[in-house]
Each structure stands twice: as C-alpha cells, then as structure tokens.
C-alpha cells in the first residue's frame, strides 16, 4: 500500500443547531457544525408528517392529458 495517501483523522465535536453535541471522527477538522442530527431529525424522533400528493398527481394528469390525445 502507498504511504501518506490517507487524510488526517481528527477527534471532532459535532455541534447541531438544536444544541446536541457528540464526539465523532472527522477529516474536516476539530469542530463540525450541522443543521440537523439524529436527535432532532423527524425520522428519528417519530414526528414525521405524510404529505398528500394525490391532488398534485391529478392536476398533472389533467394538465398533460391533452398531449396524449390524437387529432
């Protein structure tokens, strides 16, 4: 294997916008700032909301239905 091709790995402190901090390994530096983490992400907290896209699909089909018709 080649020598000196791997990036330097630091013990970093990850700081989230929600205030959560964790010790992680990083090649970016010693302080890493993130906007969202597993402590505040809706998927992990169970506060997900479902988005009803049925109306959007119907609008799309109605709008482009005339392009599929033959004259």
UniProtKB/Swiss-Prot annotation:
What is any one GO biological process for this UniProt entry? translation
Task: Identify which cofactors the protein needs according to its UniProt entry.
Answer: Zn(2+)
Q: Does the keyword Zinc apply?
A: yes
Q: Name one GO cellular component term.
A: ribosome
Taken from the UniProt record, the cysteine pairs bridged by disulfide bonds within this chain are: none
Note accompanying the cofactor annotation: Binds 1 zinc ion per subunit.
Which GO MF terms does the UniProt record name? metal ion binding; rRNA binding; structural constituent of ribosome
Keyword Metal-binding on entry: yes
Q: Which UniProt keywords are present, listed alphabetically?
A: Metal-binding, Ribonucleoprotein, Ribosomal protein, RNA-binding, rRNA-binding, Zinc
Write out the residues that bind Zn(2+).
Answer: 16, 18, 37, 40
User: What's its job?
Assistant: Binds the 23S rRNA.
The similarity comment for this entry is: Belongs to the bacterial ribosomal protein bL31 family. Type A subfamily.
Complex formation: Part of the 50S ribosomal subunit.
Q: What is this protein called?
A: Large ribosomal subunit protein bL31
Q: What is the lineage of its organism?
A: Bacteria, Pseudomonadati, Thermodesulfobacteriota, Desulfovibrionia, Desulfovibrionales
| Gene it is expressed from | rpmE
